[in-house]
Design a protein with these regions (language model features):
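N-terminal accessory segments that target, anchor, or regulate ATP-driven/P-loop NTPase machines
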Residues: 1-121, 176, 301, 331, ...
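Dynamic helix-loop-helix/coil hinge segments at AAA+ ATPase domain boundaries and subdomain interfaces
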Residues: 115-138, 192, 397-406
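Nucleotide-binding/hydrolysis machinery
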Residues: 120, 124, 130-133, 142, ...
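Conserved post-Walker A coupling segment in P-loop NTPases
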Residues: 126, 140-208, 218-234, 299-304
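Conserved RecA-like P-loop NTPase ATPase core
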Residues: 137, 160, 184, 198, ...
Length: 454
């Protein structure tokens, strides 16, 4: 694979570059980190310029950046955590050993495999989105599903796609001859029948048990067990399930013999299970058994840039032959509307709009059902102003001055538009109301003032 590398003001030693080449990495030097592609940032001192560069790489989105220190002394733990928090994917101290380059190459190779799966038609056909928050969640799921044998706990609000993630988890599982997914909706389990639902029962175990029956643990043997809304399980049932999750063996209700089962466990919840533990509503030991890995699915309000992508995805599903486009008014309406039910809410709205649409032309504001339309012409502007006010309140509360707020807002707007235009500064400048030259000068000034990348 090909990566870029950047060392402010100089070039790394030839021996370092040769070691990277021998490890199988094709690499090229750049004067400043590009907008796209994985790369390495070399540093011989830890300063604001390094942190700003990593923060900008993180704001741009989805790329992998390894920070490699060429320092005579060991990098302190606090500095490593700060670099990771600023946006580095990993931090290495180059020790000139034969393994250093291979360790770096191994990271990039794994990440490349993960991203190949994330970009694959298998994933894109069912899970649409390109925001950083969404890509990060997909990467976490691919990592645990395809490259480990661990269980995973999916967290997130209702309607964020946890069931689709569970299905993808099973699909990406690399086990051979795996069986199907067994879904247990924990909100519908009747306490009196929970033993039979999970463990199965023998004939005559209770009134009405006219024959033996397999439960979820038997049915999931060789496959995947999905416990949806696991936070709704009562404490006594959590205790009963704990042994099975830990030992992978169970007894049927009314039976005496132990049965082995081998399944991968996926759990999902819209509750904060850490708080539930504090209040005694969820067992700590059960939590740590089901949460070998956790993957949080962001709400739609944290990935609004995905709304047009999702809307187009749903329209393509509803109109596979000739999907209509969205005119500007509908596009803006979808972007600024609130979605209490997250992606599920958006899908239902798009479905109603498409069903109301007639003709080969684009979907227009008149296709929006009357009860869904904004109540006034200023509602969209009001929502944008409310979102902006919340962001400014947060910035001021954190101690930023007016000058800092203005500068940060301007830099963030530039970064977002440049990313959306895939690095095309001419189009980005037009959207920002600047000339090409003005945008280039603003970026150059930030670089000269030590604020990292333009």
């Amino acid at each position: 694979m090909e990566i870029w590398h950047w060392f402010p003001g100089r070039q790394p030693e030839a021996a370092i570059l040769a070691a990277l080449t021998q490890a199988g990495l094709r690499h090229y030097a750049c004067e400043s980190p590009p907008l796209h592609g994985p790369g390495i940032v070399f540093f011989d001192e830890i300063n604001d310029r390094l942190f700003n560069l990593l923060r900008e790489a993180s704001c741009r989105g989805v790329e992998r950046v390894i920070a490699i220190g060429l320092l005579p002394a060991r990098i302190k733990s606090a500095a490593i955590w700060s670099l990771l928090g600023a946006g580095a994917s990993d931090v290495f101290a180059w020790d000139h050993s034969s393994n250093a380059a291979h360790e770096v190459a191994a990271r990039f190779e794994r990440w490349e495999k993960v991203d190949e799966i994330v970009r694959s038609p298998l994933v894109k056909a069912n899970l649409a989105g390109q925001s950083w928050a969404w890509i990060r969640a997909l990467r976490q799921l691919v990592e645990v599903a395809h490259f480990t044998a661990s269980s995973v706990l999916l967290t997130g609000e209702s309607g964020t796609g946890k069931e689709l993630f569970a299905q993808l988890f099973h699909t990406l599982d690399s086990r051979k001859n795996k069986r199907d997914v067994v879904v247990c909706d924990c909100t519908t389990i009747v306490p009196e029948l929970s033993g039979s639902e999970f463990f199965g029962h023998e004939r005559g175990a209770f009134t009405g048990a006219v024959s033996a029956r397999d439960g979820a643990f038997a049915l999931a043997d060789g496959g995947t067990l999905f416990l949806d809304e696991v936070g709704e399980l009562p404490l006594n049932l959590q205790a009963e399930l704990l042994r099975v999750v830990q030992e992978r063996s169970y007894k049927r209700v009314g039976g005496n013999s132990w049965h082995k089962t081998n399944f991968r466990l996926v759990c999902a919840t819209n509750r904060n299970l850490n708080e539930e533990q504090i209040h005694g509503r969820f067992r700590c030991d059960f939590y740590y058994r089901i949460a070998s890995w956790t993957c949080h699915l962001p709400p739609l309000c944290e990935r609004r840039e995905d709304i047009p992508v999702l809307a187009k995805h749903f329209i393509n599903q509803l109109c596979p032959g000739s999907p209509p486009d969205l005119d500007d008014a509908v596009h803006e309406y979808l972007l600024t509307r609130d979605y209490i039910g997250n992606v599920r809410d958006l899908k239902q709205l798009v479905t109603r709009i498409v069903q109301h649409h007639v003709g080969p032309g684009p979907i227009t504001a008149g296709d929006i059902p009357p009860n869904e339309r904004p109540r006034g012409s200023n509602e969209s502007n009001d929502r944008r102003e409310q979102s902006l006010e919340l962001a400014v309140r947060s910035a001021v509360a954190s101690g930023l001055s007016l000058r800092d707020v203005e500068r940060s807002a301007g830099e963030l707007a530039e970064r977002i538009v440049i990313e959306e235009e895939q690095g095309n500064l001419q189009r980005a400048a037009a959207r920002l109301g600047l000339t090409d030259r003005a945008l280039q000068m603003r970026r150059a000034a930030r670089r000269q003032n030590g604020n990292g990348k333009p």
